[in-house]
Curated annotation (Swiss-Prot):
It comes from the Eukaryota. The lineage of its organism: Eukaryota, Metazoa, Chordata, Craniata, Vertebrata. Disulfide bonds: none annotated. It comes from Rattus norvegicus. This is BLOC-2 complex member HPS6. One of its GO terms (molecular function) is GTP-dependent protein binding. One of its GO terms (cellular component) is lysosomal membrane. Component of the biogenesis of lysosome-related organelles complex-2 (or BLOC2) composed of HPS3, HPS5 and HPS6. Interacts with HPS5 and HPS3. Interacts with biogenesis of lysosome-related organelles complex-1 (BLOC1). Interacts with AP-3 complex. Interacts with DCTN1 and dynein intermediate chain.
Length: 809
């Protein structure tokens, strides 16, 4: 069913003070300036110069006194009047072309009173061309008289303006006070000023020099920068502009440093400018509506059915709920901002229609609860709102029904059952507590005291976050505020499933504020170093399960979005690379079976290496630490080979010695690698004691000699000294003296285990007692047989019998 845009009457203006005067002024001159206070209770009307009294009217809805001001023909009327934003009490600022500024406010006593009167241009000879108020600042563009250093001429007159800013102090019992002045831009053309809630737009006017009339500026006080944009050229450039740091710019110097901005181009043919929450709306003379975004980019929103008739016709632009509303004369057109499609076109009964800005966020307004976010129209007939209304016959589900329907889809995505979950099953099944608790809260059966006790912690966190947001909006200590907000958001995301949009937001925070994001992760995982330099964690397994969840096998990271573990490793590698290997080792201890994606997943050390760069371009020291700490045989052997290649012998030996008895094969493989190096050159001789400790206990001396023989170079000489014709600096060959320590190690291990296991054992060990000396005397038959002749070798049986007889005789 198609939704319908409706005009709903909010007030016939009878509840405003001075309703008759208010209707009279609204039905009169269409060029009247209309503004609304941030709380929506005050309406301000300023008539153009030369109009009959009163020229200024401030009407109040409900109790209160109106404000009427009139100026004689000799006294000019104010150039502009507006409410001070972000104030609990209403306050007005009146600015004249001469620079005279008055601040009016409502105190404890009824009625309006003058709080302050000051001059924006104390030197004289200057006049204010445009003025705006944004986020505690008063900004104006003033035309100055040419100085002595300025060359006379038309070009000098075109750039004799400057843009100034004055702080608005809204604290204390005295109300609003104007502070010190700072110049933002020197030698600039005439600019119009349009303020939104966050940015200030400096737009060209009909008197702007044609050569720069295609350029506009966007100043963001909270970010301390100005963006120079040329919508017709598609160019934008950012520069620092922070009054707190004393930043100021010469407009001509600023443009000369930006290539392409001074290209010949027609001035912007704009009929109407209007601020919005997304940027600045502009309507050209052909009926095309464009949006200049806060970063300087421009996009077309849509094309109106009819174009404005000249520059004199009245037009107003506004947005609500993704819809663009344009009042052109007595016609109201509604367009979809995403597609530009015309949604609805209405013909109004009057062409004296004014669009009002929506109330400030967080302001309580009982009449706007049902129409919150809707666009408001003001005419002599009353105050209306433009909103979308559901067609008749469409049944809107209750809040409790929406809770169970949303929970049904949530549980269905995570259910392992084949049957479809239904809202009725969630209502009556006691296993699903969360939707039932939320539905009970919405139903309101819990007493306020019990509900407050249940939600006290959540409300405290919510209040602190809202206070932090208000601090950021005010622009106070933004660096600390953004850091704290990032910590809150990371802690919240770690309580979710970290998939889809949550994972994308997790990546965005780490890219924008890596230090704050890692600090929040440190607290969530409860990471603490121990005395041995390792990391410990007291976080529950559910948190580690979310962090270590691997991506789906065979799929690349979409749009550069990294899984949580890869993102943490990347951040830690940039901030504190020395803690990355201990973090990966801790993650390997915390990881459990089935925590990866479907199918086999990569080991954690390889996932950490993947974010450090391609192979060959990674930091070598960090890669070695990750390989050695992985505990994987292939990774450890790869690290040992790299250490051998770099001739870091002691570290390679320590890598093998640190392995416990549960890895005998890996330790033996490392010993074989180092033994091969020991056999080929003499650069490992100084570390021979460590090599002996690394020798496996099951290696026998003959096996050791066979291994050494296998790895001996083919051109090794037979002597322990270089040949006479050998090249200088040649490696001496391996000698028995060097091998003796290894043979003694294997011999000692073999001797302590029992009987002799090798034929070389008697070479290394003697009994310490010589054999007994044979007796001296006549030689017996047995003794004669010790020196047998050829005739003495007879059959074995006969010889054995003769010897036996001789012994016992």
């Amino acid at each position: 069913m198609k939704r319908a845009g409706t005009l709903r009457l909010l007030s016939d203006l009878s509840n405003f003070t001075g309703a008759a005067r208010l209707r009279e002024l609204l039905a009169g001159d269409p060029a009247i300036l209309v503004r609304c206070s941030p709380d929506g209770r005050h309406l301000l009307l300023l008539r153009p110069p030369g109009s009959p009294a009163p020229q200024l009217l401030v009407a109040v809805r409900g109790p209160g006194l109106p404000l009427e001001r009139a100026w004689s023909e000799g006294d000019p009327s104010p150039l502009d009047v507006f409410f001070v934003p972000w104030l609990a009490r209403p306050a007005l600022i009146l600015v004249w072309e001469s620079g005279l500024t008055e601040v009016w406010g409502v105190g404890m006593e009824p009625g309006w009173k003058l709080l302050q009167s000051t001059e924006l241009c104390p030197d004289g000879g200057a006049r204010v061309m445009a003025v705006a108020a944004t986020r505690g600042r008063l900004v104006w563009c003033e035309e100055r008289q040419p100085g002595v250093e300025d060359q006379p001429g038309q070009l000098s007159m075109a750039f004799n303006h400057c843009v100034c800013v004055k702080t608005l102090d809204t604290s204390g019992e005295a109300g609003t006070k104007l502070g010190c002045t700072h110049i933002l831009l020197h030698h600039c053309p005439s600019f119009g000023l349009i303020a939104s809630r966050k940015e200030l737009f400096l737009v060209p006017t009909s008197t702007t020099w044609p050569g720069v009339a295609h350029v506009l500026l966007i100043w963001s006080p909270s970010k301390g920068k100005v963006i120079v944009a040329a919508p017709s050229l598609g160019l934008s450039h950012s520069k620092s502009l922070n009054p707190k740091q004393g930043d100021t710019w010469d407009f001509r110097t600023l443009l000369r440093g930006l290539p392409g901005f001074l290209s010949p181009r027609e001035p912007l043919a704009v009929h109407t400018w209007a601020p919005s929450s997304q940027g600045l709306l502009l309507l050209d003379l052909k009926g095309k509506v464009s949006l200049v975004q806060c970063h300087g980019g421009t996009r077309t929103v849509g094309l109106l059915q009819e174009a404005p008739v000249g520059l004199q016709g009245s037009a107003a632009l506004g947005t609500f709920h993704g819809t663009l509303a344009c009042v052109l004369g007595s016609t109201l057109e509604l367009l979809d901002m995403s597609s530009g499609r015309l949604l609805e076109r209405k013909v109004l009964s009057t062409d004296r229609v004014h669009l009002l800005e929506p109330p400030a966020p967080g302001v309580k307004n009982e009449e706007d609860l049902e129409t919150r976010g809707a666009l408001r129209l003001l005419s002599a007939l009353g105050l209306f709102c433009v909103c979308w209304e559901a067609p008749q016959g469409l049944e809107v589900p209750s809040d409790k029904d929406l809770v169970f329907e949303e929970a049904c889809g949530y549980y269905q995505r995570r259910s392992l059952r084949g049957t479809q979950l239904t809202p009725e099953e969630l209502r009556h099944n006691s296993m699903f507590r969360a939707p039932q608790a939320l539905a009970s809260i919405l139903q309101g059966h819990l007493p306020p005291s019990a509900l407050l006790t249940t939600l006290r912690a959540e409300l405290r966190d919510y209040r602190s976050i809202e206070q932090l947001k208000a601090q950021l909006v005010a622009g106070d200590d933004e660096e600390t505020g953004w850091t704290e907000l990032a910590e809150h958001e990371v802690a919240r995301l770690l309580r979710t499933h970290l998939t889809g949009d949550q994972l994308a937001q997790f990546n965005t925070i780490f890219q924008a504020l890596p230090t704050a994001a890692w600090s929040a992760t440190l607290q969530a995982l409860q990471l603490q170093p121990d005395r041995s330099g390792r990391l410990r964690s007291q976080a529950p397994p559910d948190v580690w399960k979310k962090v270590l969840r691997a991506p789906t096998a065979g799929k690349e990271h979409p749009n550069g979005i990294l899984p949580p573990f890869e993102l943490l490793c990347q951040c830690l590698g940039q901030l504190e690379p020395q803690w990355l290997p201990p973090f990966v080792e801790l993650a390997q201890q915390q990881g459990g079976p089935g925590w990866g994606a479907e199918g086999p997943s990569l080991p954690l050390y390889r996932r950490a290496l993947s974010v450090l760069g391609e192979e060959g371009k990674r930091p070598e020291a960090l890669e070695l630490e990750l390989l050695l700490g992985s505990g994987r045989p292939k990774a450890v052997l790869q690290a040992v080979r790299q250490l051998i290649k770099k001739e870091q012998w002691e570290r390679a030996l320590e890598a093998g010695l640190t392995l416990d008895s549960s890895s005998p094969l890996l330790r033996s493989e490392i010993f074989n690698l180092l033994l091969a190096e020991f056999a080929q050159h003499r650069r490992l001789d100084t570390h021979l004691p460590l090599l002996c400790r690394l020798c496996p206990p099951e290696v026998a001396p003959d096996e050791l000699l066979l291994l050494l023989r296998t790895h001996l170079p083919d051109d090794a000489g037979a002597t322990p000294f270089p040949e006479p014709g050998a090249e200088p600096g040649a490696e001496p060959p391996l000698t028995v003296g060097l091998v003796r320590a290894l043979l003694e190690q294997t011999g000692a291990q073999g001797r302590s285990s029992g009987p002799v296991q090798s034929t070389f054992e008697d070479i290394l060990w003697d009994s310490g007692t010589p054999p007994p000396t044979p007796p001296r005397g006549p030689m017996t038959t047995l003794q004669a047989s010790d020196h047998p002749g050829q005739e003495a070798w007879g059959p074995s049986g006969q010889g054995l019998g003769a010897a036996d007889v001789g012994v016992h005789s």
